[in-house]
């Protein structure tokens, strides 16, 4: 669908995958950003205070400090493998967050999403840079 806006300077592989990559990136971003608008509802569901849910989200956000180490590991993987690990991890984290019976598993789920989103984003960016010439 999006490939019709790309001219002939793009490789057929890029044109074939641009819609899938765009939809996947949109979905992973939605999984990553689903919590902030619903903090009060999530806190009420767990019967905890807003400050307690804030601690859970702080832990998730602090996991971003692992990004340099995650990036080094992702660089050793193939682009597709990094994207696959990221997608499986984000899906697992979202599922765990959705069905978690307590705040501890919820925190683990959103932290998984936060850490493994780096795998997908770096793998996808690397794949795009491999197939789109720099001008």
Where are the regions a protein language model picked out?
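Conserved MFS/SLC helix-loop-helix module at the cytosolic interface between two early adjacent transmembrane helices
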Residues: 65-104
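Helix-to-coil boundary motifs at intracellular loop junctions of multi-pass secondary transporters
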Residues: 45-46, 76, 127-132
């Amino acid at each position: 669908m999006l490939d019709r806006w790309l001219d002939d300077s793009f490789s057929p592989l890029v044109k074939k995958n641009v819609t899938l990559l765009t939809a996947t990136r949109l979905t992973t971003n939605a999984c990553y950003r689903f919590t902030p608008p619903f903090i009060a509802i999530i806190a009420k569901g767990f019967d905890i205070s807003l400050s307690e849910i804030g601690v859970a989200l702080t832990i998730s956000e602090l996991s971003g400090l692992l990004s340099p180490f995650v990036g080094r590991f992702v660089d050793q993987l193939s682009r597709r493998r990094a994207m696959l690990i990221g997608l499986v991890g984000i899906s697992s984290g979202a599922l765990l967050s959705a069905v978690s019976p307590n705040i501890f598993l919820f925190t683990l789920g959103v932290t998984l999403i936060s850490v493994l989103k780096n795998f997908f984003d770096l793998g996808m960016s690397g794949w795009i840079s491999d197939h789109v010439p720099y001008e």
